[in-house]
Amino acid sequence: MNDVTVVNCPTCNKQVIWDELSTWRPFCSKRCQLIDLGEWAAEEKRIPSSGDLNDSDDWSEQPLDRQ
């Protein structure tokens, strides 16, 4: 069985074969990878959240005991 997985590049929608030889997968090229990274760095893309945390919210970490 020789199933070939093909995905679309998230940046330009060019088809990319998903295997070890596809260096930039899921992107088709280093250029498309850097365009995507730049969009994240410029905060054009983000992971949705339920809201911002503020100092009064409960945190999962324990406060440091500074003595």
From Swiss-Prot:
Binding-site list for Zn(2+): C9, C12, C28, C32
Chain positions covered by the region annotation Disordered: 46-67
Cofactor binding description: Binds 1 zinc ion.
Keyword Metal-binding among UniProt keywords: yes
Gene3D superfamilies in the record: Erythroid Transcription Factor GATA-1, subunit A
Subunit structure: Interacts with GyrB.
HAMAP family: DNA_gyrase_inhibitor_YacG
Protein name: DNA gyrase inhibitor YacG
